[in-house]
Amino acid sequence: MITNKLRRTLIVGALVSASVLAGCVSQEKYNKLNDAYVKLQQAYQGDEVEIKQLQGELKVTIKDKILFPEGGFRLDAKAQAVLAKMVPTLSGFQNTKIVVRGYTDSVPIGADLKREGVTTNLDLSSKRADNVVDFLLKKGVSANLISAQGMGESNPVASNNTPDGRAQNRRIEVTLVGPGN
């Protein structure tokens, strides 16, 4: 029979152990994301790519003009070369969610895109994110880890009232979230 004093000691010990283990996992996650940050900074040196290490995640933002022709969603050879730079880093993760989000400005969809079945900015951003994911999958990034989301004109990072603001809002974000191994 376990006494109350022994029971309290065991509970406190279990809580301390859990806290220590959680700290180790957090430090390991931080180290893995930091290593990825350094590798991506080196890979994209001089490119129009922004890499940010945030609380428990790593975000790579690529301006759409690097990846897509204006109003388009297909990746050309230059775009594929830009995306290929992140493949070695992304392929090193086994237990980390990789979310590819496409964003647009608020300019209405033109007639050319409508003829291709793209009727809204949400459709356009979804096709862009899907094409990035398809490319990364073909290059060996695990299908179990990666997903695509079209965000349309939601979550602008700048005003859509100026050409520069609209250009900033047209982007792809690749975010790594999760345990980091």
What name fits each language-model region?
Residues 39-46, 71-102, 106-108, 133-137, ...:
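Periplasmic peptidoglycan-binding/anchoring modules of Gram-negative envelope and division proteins
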Residues 73, 103-181:
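Periplasmic OmpA-like peptidoglycan-binding domain that tethers envelope proteins to the cell wall
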Residues 44-47, 55-57, 63, 85, ...:
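Extracytoplasmic
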Residues 25-28:
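Bacterial signal peptide processing site
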Residues 20-23:
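C-terminal motif of bacterial Sec signal peptides marking the signal peptidase cleavage site
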Residues 55-84, 104-121:
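Short, solvent-exposed beta-strand/turn patches at coil↔beta or beta↔helix junctions
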Residues 1-14:
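Bacterial N-terminal signal peptides that target proteins for export
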